[in-house]
Amino acid sequence: MSIYVGNLSYEVTQEDISNVFAEYGSVKRVVLPTDRETGRLRGFAFVEMGSDAEETAAIEGLDGAEWMGRDLKVNKAKPKEDRGSFGGGNRGGYGGGGGGGRSRY
């Protein structure tokens, strides 16, 4: 299981997150997703702790806490397949308004 950490500063590093979560136990892994096109951090992370008890303690201790000027959103990460059935998944971005780059005149 892993923990979802949202509303992060775009300046945060894996080391910053590891240090905060280390207060609640051993941090096995920190993943900071970046935007595919810009390479910029997306403002959330996933943290994997050494045990379920450590993850629960971290969630209870950090959810809603202010860190780096932001109120953290910390909860159990949902498995990818359950993340929502809003259709399309990662296929979006090409249809609709995507064809306006070339002028015919």
UniProtKB/Swiss-Prot annotation:
Residues 85-105 have a biased composition (Gly residues). Residues 75-105 are annotated as: Disordered. It comes from the Bacteria. This is Putative RNA-binding protein RbpF. It holds the Pfam family RRM_1. Keywords: RNA-binding. PROSITE patterns: RRM. Residues 75-84 have a biased composition (Basic and acidic residues). InterPro entries: Nucleotide-bd_a/b_plait_sf (IPR012677), RBD_domain_sf (IPR035979), RRM_dom (IPR000504), SLIRP/GR-RBP-like (IPR052462). The lineage of its organism: Bacteria, Bacillati, Cyanobacteriota, Cyanophyceae, Nostocales. Residues 2-79 form the RRM domain. GO terms for molecular function: RNA binding.
